[in-house]
Design a protein with these regions (language model features):
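Typically the conserved alpha-helix immediately C-terminal to a functionally engaged Cys/Sec
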Residues: 79-94
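Non-catalytic, surface beta->alpha helical segment in thiol-disulfide oxidoreductase systems
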Residues: 133, 141-181
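Thiol-based oxidoreductase modules, predominantly thioredoxin-like and allied folds used
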Residues: 92-120
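N-terminal export signals
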Residues: 6-25
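Short active-site neighborhood of thiol/selenol oxidoreductases, capturing the structured segment around
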Residues: 62-75
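N-proximal helix/coil linker or "cap" segments that precede and/or mark the start of modular domains
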Residues: 26-44
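Structural micro-motif
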Residues: 122-138
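A short beta-strand-turn-helix
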Residues: 48-64
Length: 195
């Protein structure tokens, strides 16, 4: 598993991979709204019954990957995720078109059903998954064969621990979408794609 230190280094290395197009009259993106829980939300985030097995199956039906973004009220990095990364059309479009992204609150009380059938409140699940930073994005496999009674923490194929600038952020989503994790470490992927 990649460490936060390694990830930050990779994020800086990937900085030149994306020439972000600014938001303009020709390229409008509505600003995000804030939900009742104090979290910014994207209109394309999925809203479900919070059963991860069902969410993954639905993502597959849509031809997408399933990922969870953990956030919290008052998190400045979470705010930047929405006001910086998701305001870049290339980033927003790639994530929206290729992932079913479910937003959870590290302090939330909604009941979530993990892949192994365990039902926990969001905050309990965040502890179970060892979510230490916000935003954190967990990426899960696209197949059901991997479940076999395992929790999401054991199933995740990649994790983005904290805020990354748009180039590195997009690179991680591409890494997962292409299933590059099956053959490369993230650093190797960055090295190969930045050439």
């Amino acid at each position: 598993m990649i460490t936060r230190r390694d990830f930050v280094g990779l994020a800086l290395a990937a900085g030149g991979l994306l020439a972000a197009r600014p938001v303009s009259a020709e390229n409008p993106i509505a600003p995000p709204e804030m939900g009742d829980d104090g979290l910014y939300v994207q209109p394309w985030y999925i809203h479900t019954f919070l059963d991860f097995r069902e969410d993954l199956i639905a993502a597959r039906r849509h031809g997408k990957r399933f990922a969870v973004v953990w956030e919290q009220k008052g998190c400045s990095a979470c705010k930047r995720l929405h006001l910086v990364n998701f305001r870049v059309p290339e980033v927003r479009d790639f994530v929206r078109d290729n992932f079913d992204l479910l937003q959870l609150n590290v302090h939330g009380s909604r009941e979530v059903t993990d892949f192994d059938g365990t039902m926990l409140e969001e905050r309990q699940l965040a502890r179970r998954y060892q979510v230490l930073y916000t935003p954190t994005i967990q990426f899960f496999p696209d197949g059901l064969d991997e479940f076999k009674g395992r929790s999401g923490k054991d199933l995740e194929v990649a994790r983005m621990p904290g805020f990354l600038l748009p180039p590195a952020f997009l690179t991680m989503f591409r890494f997962v979408r292409e299933k590059a994790y099956e053959r490369l470490r993230f650093q190797e992927y960055v090295d190969r794609t930045s050439v």
